[in-house]
A protein has these predicted regions:
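DUTPase catalytic domain/fold
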Residues: 1-153
Length: 153
């Protein structure tokens, strides 16, 4: 088992032994809306309809060069109409992990301090080299068929 060093004001742990990721919490909020910039976060924080914020997690990782960390939404927060944007933490990054969060509903939603907001999944990277080509082989069962190509249901 690979050990990854981290710094955080709380313990990172899996909910269940078989889980892929560890939960991270809202530690503070950065208001990126120009009208609200510089205002203090008041507990609980009300995220307005269509508002995007950056939720700081208080978590710093020391990833080995051949690892990455994926920031993924938690299903429970998604049920509330909160979109947690997928993100990647590269191995060379040593800053605080921040999660972009958007309220996609037409009503205000409360975010509590220390609320679980996302999960971190740490993966070993496979080394790849992208080679530019003039042609791409389209001879697969799918070919270039994109959105909706498998039908509605």
């Amino acid at each position: 088992m690979k050990e990854i060093r981290y710094k955080a004001p709380y313990r990172l742990k899996k909910g269940y032994k078989s889980d892929s990721g560890v939960d991270v919490k809202i530690w503070s909020i950065d208001l990126i809306d120009e009208k609200l910039k510089g205002k203090k976060w008041v507990d609980p924080y009300i995220i307005l309809p269509n508002q995007t914020i950056h939720a700081q997690t208080g978590v710093y990782l020391e990833l080995p060069e051949d690892y990455e960390c994926q920031v993924r939404p938690k299903s429970g927060i998604s049920k509330q109409g909160i979109l947690v944007h997928f993100g990647t933490v590269d191995s060379g990054f040593r800053g605080e992990i921040t999660v972009a969060v958007t309220n996609v509903t037409n009503k205000a939603i409360e975010l509590e301090p220390r609320q679980k907001i996302a999960q971190l999944v740490i993966k070993k990277k496979d080394p790849v080299e992208l080679i530019r080509a003039d042609e791409i082989d389209l001879d697969t069962d799918r070919g270039a068929k994109g959105y909706g190509s498998t039908g509605k249901f």
